């Protein structure tokens, strides 16, 4: 496992400038690996942080075509070609606070090239079709800008971007037409051209930052087509099959055999939750490509929990998301799992919920069961962990096929951290408690420390009574329990 994370879009540009008490509490909830005096975690220990590299819509104001000032971004590049390293200060504050709390993997992602380079002079795709909103003569300029951002953040903030993503959801059928946010579509051929330009720019500057592609909007665009044509589908085959001569990136410096995709729209019905991920993994395995799930939140088709509208601090959303995490890891083989926005508003897209004044200059932040549910994974399954297979048996000792996954009952995954500790994450989706017995073939493991997330005050990775290895334990109804070996 490579880690668990979230992104700073777009709230951190504001919250990062709020009073210290709010900023520090927010950072602790997201990144801390410390415990209180009773052994209860203070935060969820995210190990990956996505930084949105702005395109410059902020300075355009309403002329940007983006309605909300919350979703407009600044840009390090000035119109005259010089750089302004005072830009995006709130986000950069969170970069530093993340690093201070142990985060080591930082991803810089673009929703749009800088507005100075785009076809329409905007960071949205308004008035255009399904191709990249970038002038042909500016591919190299965009790549050089990305290289300068990598250098600038390290020089000014001490932050090393491990990965940079040139595009975000380029296969989205809505084509990123405003007025909601920055974005651009792109064909596979255009993405390959961008990746090669980024590779050349990074190589010339001696940067070892990796180029991550292609942040697909839907898993089905990665191994097939979905609501677009072939030019924006079959991403895995396009970039990692040598027969795809125009788009093959398997021998491009700085481009790892790693695909990033988003699990939006594929979480219901329940059979699709499994089958789509199995098709994805089959294709990834065929071309020897690893996979990161880098973004998701609750959308309108997630009807089981009422869709995305209206924030929910309860276990209803937390368990629904835990089920997605389980399936992405078990059936899609995700080595990393990342939520969309770390902090959001009155929508189910934030781990935390912000309440701000109209100007966005002050406010407060509250936690949610969703935050702590992700923490059942992120706080204990650390970078470098190996996911272990699980053999499940019934009461007679007979093996149960896929016994680690009951979509309406218990779902279990197991890991071994690099330090030798074992971790078992158990999700109980059912409305009644479930009994189970488990053990590992490791003589050093004598007992397990469970951490419970459930409805109720204080039940946020709450340490409860230890369990002996091989002894029966009870998983409370509608809860998530992580067991850590002792």
What does each model-found stretch correspond to?
Residues 151, 181-324, 331:
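Noncatalytic carbohydrate-binding groove/subsite architecture in carbohydrate-active enzymes
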Residues 397-444, 478:
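Carbohydrate-binding surface patches
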Residues 463-486:
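C-terminal beta-strand-rich structural cap/linker in extracellular carbohydrate-active enzymes
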Residues 441-460:
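Solvent-exposed beta-hairpin/edge-strand motifs
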Residues 9-14, 54-58, 112-116, 167-173, ...:
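Solvent-exposed loop/turn segments at secondary-structure junctions
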Residues 2-8, 47-53, 57, 105-109, ...:
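Structural recognition of the beta-strand scaffold that forms the well-ordered cores
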Residues 290-381, 385-401:
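Aromatic/acidic polysaccharide-binding cleft in carbohydrate-active enzymes
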Residues 1-161, 174, 181-192, 196, ...:
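N-terminal catalytic cores of secreted or lumenal carbohydrate-active enzymes
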């Amino acid at each position: 496992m490579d880690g668990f994370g979230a992104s700073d879009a777009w709230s951190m540009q504001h919250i990062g400038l709020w009073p210290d008490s709010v900023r520090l509490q927010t950072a602790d909830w997201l990144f801390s690996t410390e415990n209180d005096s009773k052994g209860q975690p203070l935060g969820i220990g995210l190990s990956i942080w996505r930084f949105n590299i702005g395109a410059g819509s902020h300075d355009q104001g309403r002329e940007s075509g983006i309605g909300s000032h919350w979703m407009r971004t600044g840009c390090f590049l000035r119109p005259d070609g010089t750089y302004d390293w005072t830009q995006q200060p709130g986000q950069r504050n969170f970069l530093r606070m993340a690093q201070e709390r142990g985060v080591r993997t930082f991803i810089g992602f673009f929703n749009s090239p800088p507005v100075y380079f785009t076809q329409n002079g905007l960071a949205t795709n308004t008035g255009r079709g399904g191709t990249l909103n970038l002038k042909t003569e500016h591919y190299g300029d965009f790549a050089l800008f990305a290289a300068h951002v990598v250098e600038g953040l390290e020089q000014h903030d001490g932050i090393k971007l491990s990965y940079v993503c040139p595009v975000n959801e380029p296969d989205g059928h809505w084509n990123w037409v405003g007025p909601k946010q920055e974005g651009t579509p792109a064909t596979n051929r255009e993405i390959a051209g961008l990746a090669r330009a980024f590779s050349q720019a990074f190589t010339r500057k001696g940067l070892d930052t990796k180029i991550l592609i292609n942040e697909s909007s839907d898993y089905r665009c990665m191994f097939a087509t979905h609501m677009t044509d072939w030019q924006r589908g079959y991403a895995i085959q396009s970039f990692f099959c040598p027969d795809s001569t125009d788009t093959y990136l398997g021998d491009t410096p700085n481009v790892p055999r790693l695909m990033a995709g988003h699990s939006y729209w594929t979480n219901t019905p329940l059979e699709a939750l499994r089958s789509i991920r199995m098709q994805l993994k089959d294709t990834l395995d065929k071309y020897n490509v690893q996979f990161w799930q880098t973004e998701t939140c609750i959308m309108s088709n997630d009807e089981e929990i009422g869709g995305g509208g209206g924030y929910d601090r309860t276990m209803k959303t937390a368990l629904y998301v835990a089920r997605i995490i389980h399936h992405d890891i078990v059936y899609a083989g995700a080595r990393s799992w990342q939520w969309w926005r770390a902090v959001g508003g009155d929508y189910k897209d934030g781990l935390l919920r912000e309440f701000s004044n109209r100007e966005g200059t002050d406010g407060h932040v509250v936690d949610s069961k969703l935050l702590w549910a992700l923490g059942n994974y992120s706080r204990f399954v650390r970078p470098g962990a190996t996911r272990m297979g699980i053999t499940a048996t019934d009461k007679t000792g007979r093996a149960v096929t896929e016994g680690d996954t009951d979509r309406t009952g218990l779902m279990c995954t197991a890991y071994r951290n690099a330090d030798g500790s074992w971790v078992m994450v158990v999700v109980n989706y059912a409305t009644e408690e479930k009994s189970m017995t488990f053990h590992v073939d490791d003589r050093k493991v004598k007992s397990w420390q469970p951490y419970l997330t459930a409805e109720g005050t204080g039940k946020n990775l709450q340490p409860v009574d230890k369990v002996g290895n091989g002894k029966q334990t009870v998983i409370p109804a509608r809860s998530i329990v992580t067991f850590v070996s002792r």
